């Protein structure tokens, strides 16, 4: 079940390209290897360690993103500067995407190196890389959606407040007119 080393790097790079950025490109591992996926329980300890380190980096990344987002929202609450908030959210979204891509690139590079050193594990590595890449792409879509939803929520809250003010004062003006017109 060995994939030739020269094809291995190419497949890994095509897979990486499919799972980075805001793309929704589907990657079909079966189209490349034409084999049934090996059991992931057969993964060598070193390969499991590489994947565990990646998981720890990803978890730290998500914790930091959550803290940064909360801080940005608190800053809006304190400073009341919408323009700075929206700009900061845009920058944070771009930074999050870049950090995610950097992490997956580092992970895929380490998998390529490992696979070139251990050709007998290449099919297994391709299977793991495909599963991890697809999962991280789905999760990053959710992370990026948080940025969009927070901005939309703030904009909607501001719009709702303005509509409430307008509606309330229109009602007050109307009630006042009706009151005074009923006096005489």
Identify the residue ranges that each predicted region occupies.
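Membrane- and interface-active hydrophobic/amphipathic segments that mediate membrane binding, fusion
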Residues: 108-184
């Amino acid at each position: 079940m060995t994939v030739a080393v020269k094809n291995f790097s190419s497949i890994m790079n095509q897979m990486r390209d499919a799972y980075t950025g805001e793309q929704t490109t589907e990657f079909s591992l079966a189209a490349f290897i034409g084999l049934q996926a090996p059991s992931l329980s057969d993964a060598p300890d070193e390969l499991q360690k590489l994947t565990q380190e990646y998981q720890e980096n990803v978890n730290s990344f998500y914790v930091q993103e959550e803290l940064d987002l909360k801080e940005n929202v608190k800053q809006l609450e304190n400073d009341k500067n919408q323009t700075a908030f929206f700009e900061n959210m845009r920058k944070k979204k771009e930074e999050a995407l870049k950090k995610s891509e950097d992490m997956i690139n580092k992970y895929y590079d380490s998998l390529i190196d490992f696979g070139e050193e251990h050709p007998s594990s290449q099919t297994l590595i391709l299977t793991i890389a495909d599963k991890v890449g697809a999962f991280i792409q789905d999760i990053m879509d959710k992370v990026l959606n948080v940025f969009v939803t927070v901005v939309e929520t703030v904009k909607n809250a501001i719009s709702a407040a303005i509509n409430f003010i307008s509606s309330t004062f229109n009602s007050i003006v109307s009630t006042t007119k009706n009151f005074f017109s009923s006096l005489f």
